[in-house]
């Protein structure tokens, strides 16, 4: 991305801008890339299959997330690098997550797949208590001791284009971040990327 395009996106009000660099990787499979680069807690590997028979075009490899959101019994915890930095008691965890997500203004760029980061994780069966008022007060023993909701803020990922063997290395930056110049330098096209 050129600096002029980046500045234009800032003027349009975007505050979570994906910067990317593409490289051709024709000797590693998406799974091999995951095992080499992201096989850590709070990382993920998503493959797609169409119709149960054909591989989808993209594979998504989320590098270890710095920020993780956990919800249990109307309590929302935000962890950064494994430490709780915020804890809230909320009336509606799903509304809270929607509000949290709305703080990120992310442009959709033609050069990237539709999914290029965001909230990734799970919503467990127990969230029905947050949706159906009649079930809100049912106390059930938590045998698994896992959050009702766990979401990773996926800022850094690889998107493997299985059709072209190209890997998009993506990081999302906030225009107010101090390391912005380093990110722009890193993602600027080099002569060999042509």
Question: Which stretches of residues belong to each language-model region?
Answer:
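A cross-family signal for N-terminal binding/gating loops and helix N-caps
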Residues: 3-141, 145-184
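Conserved small/polar residues in nucleotide/adenosyl-binding loops
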Residues: 186-193
């Amino acid at each position: 991305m050129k600096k002029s395009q980046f500045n234009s996106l800032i003027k349009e009000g975007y505050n979570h801008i994906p910067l990317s660099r593409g490289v051709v990787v024709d000797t590693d499979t998406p799974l091999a890339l995951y095992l080499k680069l992201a096989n850590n807690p709070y990382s993920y590997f998503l493959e797609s299959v169409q119709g149960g028979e054909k591989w989808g075009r993209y594979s998504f490899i989320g590098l270890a997330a710095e920020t993780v959101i956990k919800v249990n019994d109307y309590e929302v915890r935000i962890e950064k690098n494994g430490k709780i930095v915020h804890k809230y008691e909320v009336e509606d965890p799903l509304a809270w997550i929607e509000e949290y997500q709305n703080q990120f203004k992310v442009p959709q760029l033609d050069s990237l797949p539709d999914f290029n980061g965001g909230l990734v994780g799970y919503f467990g069966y127990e969230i029905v208590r947050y949706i159906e008022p009649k079930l809100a007060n049912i106390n059930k023993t938590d045998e698994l001791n896992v959050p009702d909701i766990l979401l990773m803020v996926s800022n850094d990922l690889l998107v493997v284009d299985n059709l072209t063997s190209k890997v998009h290395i993506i990081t999302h930056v906030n225009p107010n971040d101090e390391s912005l110049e380093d990110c722009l330098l890193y993602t600027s096209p080099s002569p060999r990327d042509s």
